[in-house]
Each structure stands twice: as structure tokens, then as C-alpha cells.
Amino acid sequence: MRPFAELSQLIFPSRCFGCHRLGPSICSACRSSWHPHYYKTKVDSLTVHSALLYTPTASKIILAAKESGLKGADDLLIEAIIHVLDKSIPDTTLFRLVPIPSSKASQRRRGRSFVVDLVSQISQRTGIPMIDCLQLSRRVLDQSGLHRDERASNLAGAFTLISPARGELILIDDVVTTGATLREAARALNSQGFQAIGSVTAITACVAQRLR
């Protein structure tokens, strides 16, 4: 899907991901709901730092990146995550980015492990190393149609560690909703003696404190 998406962007004019008007990937009208700030919330003891609140515009950008593989949408998410990393990490030399992996079925459908691909690009841009150390060890359902308790049950015990994860670990995901994914990823690290000191996402659907 990825090569086709990149070819289509060469053939068809660019449109705003929010309202589909011809022009830049995010137009001035939609920019008001896609303007990275710095939000903080908690998932158990894990502090989650995010750039944006979940809005209809944010939803469209996630879908354009995740399901359509559009580079312009990828770039918006990457820039949002880098914005928060710049705000929340004083010394990048100590930290390692741990991406949340996609399921095997999602990887086959999309042609990539979505967040792993984003974090690889973030690592190249920032110089912060990535450790791709997590994998889903069993089949899980698509989280989008599940409620809070169903999400937690769906992911319980689903992540395993496939390589050591040393350093100051930061979990990276595109969006935090109920926190079930980040909670399970942190559990998998903790079970092998490693610890995530925090998490960064582009978008939060949780009640979050805006810091700046």
C-alpha cells in the first residue's frame, strides 16, 4: 500500500486532511484544531505526554496515516511527537524510544508496522535511539470498536519482549484513549526487569492537563 500511496500523491493534488480542500496538508482553518501544545495525563503510574487533543481533524489525520499510508499525514504525527519530545526530554542522550508494534494482520494490511515506522523516522530526525523490543504474542481484536474494559481484556498479557530494553525507556504510540495499550506495554517491560519512565503520544483522548 505504501508505494501506491506515495505515487498517488504525485498524481493527485494535495488536499487538507481535515476538510479535503485543495492546498497544504493542514489548511489555516483546520490548523486551529491541529496546533501542537503539551498535555500530560496518567495511566496508572505512567506519565503520558501528548501534543494534541483528540478531535475530528485529528481522527482524519490518524486514518490518513495509518490506513492510507499518506506521507503528509505521517509527517504531521511525527512532528507532533517530536514537539512533545523536545518539551519533555532535557537530555536526549540518556533515552530510548520504544514503539508500540502493530499486530501481524495489521502489518500485512498496511505494509508496515505503523508506529514502528513513525518512530524509526523520529529516531533519524532526533538522534534518539529506537529499541524495537515489543511484539504481540497472540491475536488481538481491533481496539477501535471496544469499550474500556473490553480493551483491557483484549490486550491483557498480549505483549512480550523480544530483545533487551536498556536505558531510560519512553513508550511511543500515535494516540492514547483508555490507556490499555500503554499499560500492557509497560507491564511487558516490567515483567522482564525493565521500566518505562514515561510515554509520548501525538494525540490524547484522555482528560489531560495542558501545560503549555
Which residue stretches match the model-derived regions?
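Glycine-rich phosphate/pyrophosphate-handling loop used in enzymes and phosphotransfer proteins
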Residues: 1-212
